[in-house]
Swiss-Prot record:
Role noted for this protein: Produces ATP from ADP in the presence of a proton gradient across the membrane. The catalytic sites are hosted primarily by the beta subunits.
Database matches in SMART domains: AAA (SM00382)
Protein's organism: Coxiella burnetii (strain RSA 493 / Nine Mile phase I)
Transmembrane segments: none
Membrane-protein topology: Peripheral membrane protein
Record's protein name: ATP synthase subunit beta
Alphabetical keyword list: ATP synthesis, ATP-binding, Cell inner membrane, Cell membrane, CF(1), Hydrogen ion transport, Ion transport, Membrane, Nucleotide-binding, Translocase, Transport
SUBUNIT field: F-type ATPases have 2 components, CF(1) - the catalytic core - and CF(0) - the membrane proton channel. CF(1) has five subunits: alpha(3), beta(3), gamma(1), delta(1), epsilon(1). CF(0) has three main subunits: a(1), b(2) and c(9-12). The alpha and beta chains form an alternating ring which encloses part of the gamma chain. CF(1) is attached to CF(0) by a central stalk formed by the gamma and epsilon chains, while a peripheral stalk is formed by the delta and b chains.
Gene symbol of the encoding locus: atpD
Superkingdom of origin: Bacteria
Keyword Nucleotide-binding listed: yes
HAMAP family from the UniProt entry: ATP_synth_beta_bact
Amino acid sequence: MTTAKSGTTIEIIGAVVDVEFPRHAVPKVYDALQVDENNLTLEVQQQLGDGVVRTIAMGSTEGLKRDIAVKNTEKPIEVPVGKETLGRIMNVLGEPIDELGPINSKEKLPIHRPAPSFIEQSGATELLETGIKVVDLLCPFAKGGKVGLFGGAGVGKTVNMMELIRNIAIEHSGYSVFAGVGERTREGNDFYHEMKESNVLDKVALVYGQMNEPPGNRLRVGLTGLTLAEAFRDEGRDVLLFIDNIFRYTLAGVEVSALLGRMPSAVGYQPTLAEEMGALQERITSTKKGSITSIQAVYVPADDLTDPSPATTFAHLDATVVLSRQIAERGIYPAIDPLDSTSRQLDPLIIGEEHYRVARGVQETLQRYEELKDIIAILGMDELSEDDKRAVRRARKIQRFLSQPFFVAEVFTGAPGKYVSLQDTIRGFKGIINGEYDELPEQAFYMVGSIEEAVEKAKSL
């Protein structure tokens, strides 16, 4: 039976479902449709004419058949927002999946909203201390900025992100929203228990659309998480939005794009790649009311940073943290590349003269070592001048001092985690490049927090 607001399914191809409505009651693009028989939500993507709309399913289409009644809700997908969402795990539709009962929030907001206008936005120059030495020194984060964690498979994107959430929740007691976009379910589960054990779960709202979910879920779960973060921001808070992984958001778009009948573009990506990325990224911004600081893990296919997906993401970021396989192979964790990682905040007017000089000094020393590596490989250390030998020794100490034991990795390493303040970080590296610790062995600098710990460790070596 078809009423004015209901239609029927006429074609189902994978995650894409075509629905026919009466000509005078065709749903708008992004309207949510409800299939009561399968308890499935569809989102309108295209109007094909003759009353037919093409939709993406926000769930599995198994068991769906033609001629089933579909109801138009006449509004986009809406999700619960506010403090009631903290400590809870939700799916793309804002439904709880942690078996702890319903989320009784006072307000629901649509996941499709316009980005704040130019007048509402505010610039960000205040620094956010993370307690991770290499980040605070060489690619400092701004409150209200966007940060990308770039890395191939298995170099530690998720572990770095978990450490950042833990440090910021405990040291800055801020609210965070975590959107798991197409990542491993095991990681999502580990993450939940990690937050629980660190007693920061009551400050984090979790939204998951994992690898095993249909592409519709993975395509929209980022927007669900973003909507939660926007609500906290509009209450006047400084909120953190973690997205793991932004590449899977692109990938879900690829999966759906062909089914929607679009021609693929470069490397088989969807032709609307830049527009889809922009729609998400432009909403992640700080307004005069509050700020959203976003940290996004970016998987780099085959370690190729020129691939269209990471390349499109680069354009939106204030800071890029590049994880390197070569550094991970040397056993230095976090495996952040100190010469490849960048930040717009690395400016003497923002971070101060001393911090800037130390950061540039560290990079100069490491760069000199990189240049000398070929000579060392062919002729050995003995052929270098005294100045170059000293630079190499200091660079090797700096490399090791950039490593640090993480709180979230205690279970793997057995070493207690360390949070290092920005002052301690600057002081330590300043001492190394000024030659104050030239007599200490390299090994003393490996996997310690502050410089005092390195001095203590040297005594026992």
